[in-house]
UniProtKB/Swiss-Prot annotation:
Pathway given in the UniProt record: Amino-acid biosynthesis; L-arginine biosynthesis; L-arginine from L-ornithine and carbamoyl phosphate: step 2/3
Provenance organism: Nocardia farcinica (strain IFM 10152)
Subunit structure: Homotetramer.
Name of the gene encoding the protein in the UniProt record: argG
The protein, known as: Argininosuccinate synthase
Gene Ontology MF terms: argininosuccinate synthase activity; ATP binding
Keywords per UniProt: Amino-acid biosynthesis, Arginine biosynthesis, ATP-binding, Cytoplasm, Ligase, Nucleotide-binding
Amino acid sequence: MSERVVLAYSGGLDTSVAISWIGKETGAEVVAVAIDLGQGGEDMNVVRQRALDCGAVESIVIDARDEFAEQYCLPTIQANALYMGQYPLVSAISRPLIVKHLVEAAKFHGADTVAHGCTGKGNDQVRFEVGIGALAPDLNVIAPVRDYAWTREKAIAFAEENKLPINVTKKSPFSIDQNVWGRAVETGFLEDLWNAPTKDVYDYTADPTVNFEAPDELIITFDKGVPVAIDGRPVSVLEAIVELNHRAGRQGVGRLDMVEDRLVGIKSREIYEAPGAITLITAHQALEHVTIERELGRYKRQVEQRWGELAYDGLWFSPLKRALDAFVQDTQQHVSGDIRMVLHGGSAVVNGRRSEQSLYDFNLATYDEGDTFDQSLAKGFVQIHGLSSKVAARRDLNQK
């Protein structure tokens, strides 16, 4: 059997050209692996056939939607992970899943080389290659777009010269990546930071300033940090994301326009749509505020930031990430209950919380009759709490 290369295949121009190019340049057979992450668009059977038509000896489509939701999106919810306080890691958390299946396919087909279509300016090259190195350190990696400085024009010329069945007549001005967790848009006129996004940038969300529908009130139920029901109806994690993408997206929830610090050292403007992700993370945070003790909550917020950075930086399979996963999972033991939210005008606003695991004690919190808080203890507490500051202040005043 000839040497084989396993390619992470998207169905787009670059990876379609890569199939033929790898065969011609290396003499290897190409096995194309396409992952269904709920990205929509083309039928995956069409994508599979295109890979074969471009010269792949085998073309595999893997339905990983539930796996993505349960093993990648759910940990992101439980970690309340928002890179730079905003971005719910739409693309970042999909890459380790693709890497996992790429490595498994390489082992199954006896390949010692894998390939991807990432450029040299983005984060994904790091996510792919660091992830591959963590799971299969002996695998070789080919990155033709990066290593041979492919441009769109070069790729089109190669496709035409080799009569590859790729339709390249219509060119979007944007680079788009999407899955069930959200949608990322960049490049084109968006590279000028002063240019406002036009309506054609968006697809997952309605314009909240124009499409002012009636508010949508809903209740999300969590069990140990897992969303298990919407409005009392049981749902899987995937079903929760899909339903909230529709309901929150219709209200314009989840639009982000940010300048992002890329791992490779440059700043990049990104437009994100993540209605389901933002709604679920907002609800989960609200329930944690009710059910997690103060010091644990404070420390978890530090962990959340680092967790998001590790996921963004391609270190999903790192020892530190695994350790933080264990910490986050332990914090979820009491994160059970209901969160009521109103979706409207681009916002997901929490307006109700209830939980049998709640640490909120009405009788301690109330200022009305029935107050059980012993205020006689407060004076001594205040004095002890501020004692070190008072001692330091006396020293400083005496030295003036």
